[in-house]
Amino acid sequence: MKAPFTSLAGFRAVFDALPQPDAAALEAATARNGQLTKPKGALGRLEGLAIWYAGWVGDGRPALERPQVAIFAGNHGIAARGVSAFPPEVTVQMVANYRAGGAAVNQLCKVAGASMTVTELDLDRPTLDFTQGPAMTEDELVAALAAGWEAVEDEADLLVVGEMGIGNTTAAAAIAAALFGGSAGEWTGRGSGVEGAALEGKTLVVAQGLERHAEALSDPVEVLRRLGGRELAAMAGAIARARVGRIPVILDGFICSAAAAVLHAIRPGALDHAVAGHVSAEGAHPAVLARLGKEPILELGMRLGEGTGAIVAINILRSAVACLSGMATFAEAGVAEG
């Protein structure tokens, strides 16, 4: 779907009338769940996940058949400040690895039966170092939001967004601090593995960015423009597109959650179509999920990003949907109810 906006005002307008889950499908799924051949609540959280999914896809007896994993890659001006354990050229190299099928995300997509798309966002033009000025111009932000929006496949019945961009945990930390308050140190973690003096330097970069843009940080769209990156903006655009199309979303780790938090800040409830696939080992991720009111499905100590934790959760959701839709009711099975 072509993005319905050509300006930041147009993007904001998307949130004026967001679709809600289908009430009839929710009612039907809830009723069916109560009639299945199991004790009430015996499948635990799987039951709630299946009903949530049914409401968003508008089917009381749904199927999960076309999950899409959309990866976005962008480069950051702040990478030149030594905030990552890897050089900026790794972004381009990892995109090539995705296309060759050699990354972890490729293997996990195969297991999950998910299609995978990779969108490169001006990799030859890093964003501006946000300690020196806004990371993106308004036009650059609109273009990145639109790229994310248009990357979502119309036929997808589940979306996972992932990212590649050296320096993007720094941008995510700055966004989280700007949206939720607190010091740079509370939100800045090891990312790709920095520690000691390098971690102190990374934290200082976040603090300098927050100070530089302090007067504009009450506007979540400006937070994204000034402190974010193209791939974070594209993830936000894709998640917004999914809401408009009532496509359920599984959120990934810290970076993805920070991008999604911008939408939550624009309008509370904007992430009702999303669940948290996992809680990552990046230290501030639990705090972001708590602010978003999201309970993670998995806790596996993962911190790779790229959508990987969310992809692992796809088969958990698929299992939930399969039980709701495939199990017999007591009446169908001729089993006496307890």
Swiss-Prot record:
EC id: 2.4.2.21
Catalytic activity: 5,6-dimethylbenzimidazole + nicotinate beta-D-ribonucleotide = alpha-ribazole 5'-phosphate + nicotinate + H(+)
Pathway the protein takes part in: Nucleoside biosynthesis; alpha-ribazole biosynthesis; alpha-ribazole from 5,6-dimethylbenzimidazole: step 1/2
Keyword Cell inner membrane on entry: no
Enzyme active site: 306 (proton acceptor)
Gene Ontology MF terms: nicotinate-nucleotide-dimethylbenzimidazole phosphoribosyltransferase activity
Keyword Transcription: no
Enzyme class of the recorded protein, top EC level: transferase
Entries under Pfam families matching the protein: DBI_PRT
Function, in words: Catalyzes the synthesis of alpha-ribazole-5'-phosphate from nicotinate mononucleotide (NAMN) and 5,6-dimethylbenzimidazole (DMB).
Family: Belongs to the CobT family.
NCBIfam families, sorted: cobT_DBIPRT, PRK00105.1
Protein name per the record: Nicotinate-nucleotide--dimethylbenzimidazole phosphoribosyltransferase
Gene (name only): cobT
